[in-house]
A protein has these predicted regions:
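Glycine- and acidic
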Residues: 8-10, 60-64, 185-186, 205-208
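Long, charged alpha-helical interface segments
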Residues: 1-33, 120-122
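Divalent metal-dependent catalytic cores for phosphoryl transfer on phosphate-bearing substrates
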Residues: 17, 29-157
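Charged substrate- and nucleic-acid-binding regions of tRNA-handling and nucleotidyl-transfer enzymes
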Residues: 37, 41, 82-86, 146-216
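Helical mechanochemical/support elements of P-loop NTPase systems and associated helical scaffolds
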Residues: 21, 93, 194-197
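Short linear loop/turn motifs
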Residues: 2-7, 97-99, 197-208
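A generic alpha-helix surface/boundary motif
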Residues: 23-26, 77-78, 180-185
Length: 216
């Protein structure tokens, strides 16, 4: 994190340099978890600690003199993996932290399809998607509160998204192929030949269900 010290973000959305921002996000993430009545998880705290680790590497300045950090979530996830692997941390922890970092800055809306697609991106072998989705909201909330006060309004939207995501999960709305009411065997029985087309059709079906164009 040394390059982040005194690194001016040159943005109206940030009241602090990169290092101070990271410190505040880390502190807020832990304190708000305790306020919610739970101990902050290791994955949340590591993600808060490393979420902007690649900002100095991605810094650009536009014609108006404003700073931008395009690609820092993706590069940050890669750098975090290297750091955490070097520390011999568990595979599951590294995987979850990298997912949180990769998507911490992704624009989201409190809409069904948007949140189901986010869960789809977070899902994978061994991933506890409901927990990780909630931690993504925790990270976004802490990240927002570590910016300029003019950004704080977004916390209300984050809580709207959290509530809707929990409703979707409780209702069993599908966000993975395994959650579809049909599978590859069903397609084969109606004449689809085994091969890549099966996966393409199932993914198209999941797209349609997520967009609420067809029922599951």
């Amino acid at each position: 994190l040394a390059p982040a010290r005194w690194f001016d973000q040159r943005s109206v959305y940030h009241a602090f340099n990169v290092y101070e921002h990271i410190a505040r996000v880390l502190t807020v993430a832990g304190e708000l978890a305790l306020c919610d009545g739970v101990a902050p998880s290791s994955s949340l705290m590591w993600a808060a600690f490393l979420h902007d680790v690649s900002k100095p590497d991605c810094f650009t300045v536009d014609h108006a003199g404003s700073g931008h950090f395009y690609g820092h979530p993706e590069l940050g996830a890669k750098k975090a993996r290297v750091i955490m692997d070097r520390l011999a941390l568990s595979h599951d922890l590294v995987r979850d932290v990298c997912l949180l970092i990769k998507y911490h800055d992704k624009p989201l809306r409190p809409e069904r399809s948007c949140l189901l697609n986010m869960m789809r991106a977070l899902s994978g072998e061994g991933v506890d998607t409901p927990r990780l989705m909630d931690e993504l909201m925790d990270l976004k909330r802490a990240d927002t509160l570590g910016k300029a006060p003019s950004c704080f309004y977004y916390v209300e939207t984050i809580e709207e998204m959290r509530a809707l995501a929990r409703e979707l999960l409780a209702a069993g709305e599908p966000y993975t192929l395994k959650m579809l009411a049909i599978n590859g065997g069903d397609l084969i029985r109606v004449g689809v030949k085994p091969g890549p087309e099966l996966g393409q059709l199932l993914n198209a079906a999941l797209d349609a269900v997520i967009e609420d164009n067809v029922p599951n």
